[in-house]
Amino acid sequence: MLFRSYAYLPAYKEQGLAEGLDTRQIVVTGNPIVDVIDHYFRSGKIRLSSQSRRELFRRLNVGDQNQPFALMTCHRRENVENPTSLRRVMNLVRACGYQVVFPASYRTQRSLSEFGITPPSNLLLTDPIGYVEFLELLDGCAYVLTDSGTVVEEAAVLGTPSVQMRLSTERPEVYEWGASIKFDPTI
C-alpha cells in the first residue's frame, strides 16, 4: 500500500521531509479554500445577487453609507467554555470601534447567557447564517475577529484583514503574509 501525504504549500512538504517522509509520498495540492473562493465565489457561481446582498446588509444594518463594520466568529472550546476568555473576547469587541456582526453558534449564545456576559452595544448577535451569506459579509467587512483557522484563510484570500483570537493556529503563514494579527484571550 502506498502512503500519500497531501500538503497545501511547498513549506508543508518541507516539513514532511524533515519528519522523514519520502519526497515521492508528498503531493503539494494547493489550498482548496483558494479554489472554492476563486472558482465558486469570485466567479459568481455561489454569490448572492446584488439585490440579495443589499437585503442581507440592510437586514443586519451594516454597510450603509460606507460605514465600515467588522465580522466575528467565536466557537472554540477554549474561548466559548471559559468565562474569562469569553469576557476578554467581548472586551475586544467593545474596544474595536466598529459595529461587529456576530453570527453566533447556539453553544456560544448559551455560554454568554450562562456566564451572565452582556454583549457590548456595538455587537450585533445573530443566529448562524449560511456559507454564502457569511462569505458576502467577510468580503464586505473592514476586518474579521475569529478563532477559526478556516475563516483566517478565507479572509486572507479575499483580502480582508483578520484578528486571530487564539493562542496558536494551524495556518501560521497568515502572519508571515501580514494578513492577520494575534489576540490571545486566554492570557
Placement of each model-derived feature along the sequence:
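Short, conserved active-site loop motifs that form the nucleotide-linked donor/cofactor pocket
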Residues: I26, N122-L124, S180
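Short beta-strand scaffold positions
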Residues: A7, V28, P103, L145-T146
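A donor-sugar binding/catalytic signature common to diverse glycosyltransferases
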Residues: S5, L137-V174
